[in-house]
């Protein structure tokens, strides 16, 4: 199998070609072919094919003639299925780098949000400690209590905003369903 500049050779199967046209799969196959272990695996597989399977191909020509229409039908169904999957899940046609960046952002979101929340609480505590004044246990306690109250009220306001937004969204959906 000749490979030029990371391009993959065309295949006889519409389903296999359709799979190779999906960027993530294409990039995965190219990475496997460029990896030393992948190259060795391909070489061993090709050698086994040339040694064991290639000599048997003439004997399998007649049975293949009977099976070919069924294989072509299965290939066409596989291609149609992949087309429908692409219509329903268009994200699979995005470039690999874009998918990687999106996944990285989603995975890092809880960590980033946690650090932002921690920073906000410490900042609020520092402001409250400064308002109360003094450097003793009572002032620290007052600052902690006021920080807790402020943070709790902010969370309650945020939850209320989210619920209000979802309520409006639900009303729109209900109105749309009723009117259609």
From Swiss-Prot:
The keyword rRNA-binding does not apply. It comes from the Eukaryota. The keyword Protease does not apply. Induction: Expression is positively regulated by the cAMP-dependent protein kinase catalytic subunit PkaC1. Keywords: Lipid droplet. Signal peptide: none annotated. Disruption phenotype: Reduces the cellular lipids content in both mycelia and conidia. Decreases the virulence on rubber tree leaves. It is found in: Lipid droplet. Interacts with class I hydrophobin Hydr1. Interacts also with the cAMP-dependent protein kinase catalytic subunit PkaC1. Lipid droplet coating protein that regulates lipid metabolism, appressorial turgor pressure, and virulence. Mature appressoria with high turgor pressure are essential to penetrate the leaf surface. Belongs to the perilipin family. This is Lipid droplet coating protein Cap20. It comes from Colletotrichum siamense.
